């Protein structure tokens, strides 16, 4: 079932509900930045088949929520957490108000949870590849590609076209110019948006120290972005009254010997899906 809901500033966000026959909880599935929701559908159906109604959606300017031209758009990276995720949490709460609400956040979808003023309405968070994106802690080959994208391709494309034409390069979905610039600036700092460099402009960070729900973080050792260093750099700033647990996968243990930053959601790594399901069940226990 397709859904539409509005952020506090009136921007319409779109998504879909993958309903469980007899739901025991609702899962808000937050995608990574500039990633089509269709990529997550097999995983969402897996959760629904095991009793979790899933709300899969996308951020302003991306996928089904790209409702206007990105040329000259004023969308910022922090809008994901400040404006869009709060609206998604509120919408998800209406689906089955009597049931627990969990979030599975991929990359920025978990990283920016603490920007949401209502994040403590969640009953649990599973963060998949949730870390900083610091260039300096990426493998050298990937680091060079990231620098090339953010420091060359992105500004040139923004100057020529008014937005970042990333989709034509088969990199990701197109990016609003301000979002790409802010994202790149964060990635240039080891502490990401926690850096004092952004103290006058960054969103309110207090919620990151007052989580009131359990957290499980899943990361693979071949993830080019969520490296061990980048993962620790983010989570050292985050506090919860409930446990924050980590599981580190060895890519060599996976059927195709690969996970990377996106492979967690590929059916070939269904072992990870089962671990997510087991953790959701423990949240519910």
Task: Briefly describe each language-model feature range.
Residues 1-19:
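N-terminal cap/lid segment of alpha/beta-hydrolase-fold proteins
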Residues 24, 31-35, 221:
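Active-site glycine-rich loops that stabilize anionic/oxyanionic intermediates
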Residues 37-70:
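Conserved alpha/beta-hydrolase
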Residues 74-95:
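Alpha/beta-hydrolase active-site loop
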